[in-house]
């Protein structure tokens, strides 16, 4: 089974429509939240609406061996939520797949 919707953008469209229009404020925010004890949640906010976030979560779950979901946050909109501290993994994966450039990633947390 292949992921079909991760690379839906045209590589030549940047010259036509401007740079980085697929990311809302130009940044992808990666946050970590403490749950109970040693358990944490990693949230990813700021990815373009043109990507299917459920397919991205499905791919991340397989890649990182963790559970995840897409939640509707009242302030941030649709947010990816992954179990565990996946900040470094998600940064490397987003740049490897081409969904974000390294200078667009903003990591928050401890």
UniProtKB/Swiss-Prot annotation:
GO cellular component, one term: eukaryotic 43S preinitiation complex
Record PTM Phosphothreonine, positions in chain: 40
Disulfide bridge map: none
GO MF entry, a single one: ribosomal small subunit binding
Function of the molecule: Probably involved in translation.
NCBIfam families reported in the protein's UniProt record: SUI1_MOF2
Protein name: Eukaryotic translation initiation factor eIF1
Source organism of this protein record: Drosophila melanogaster
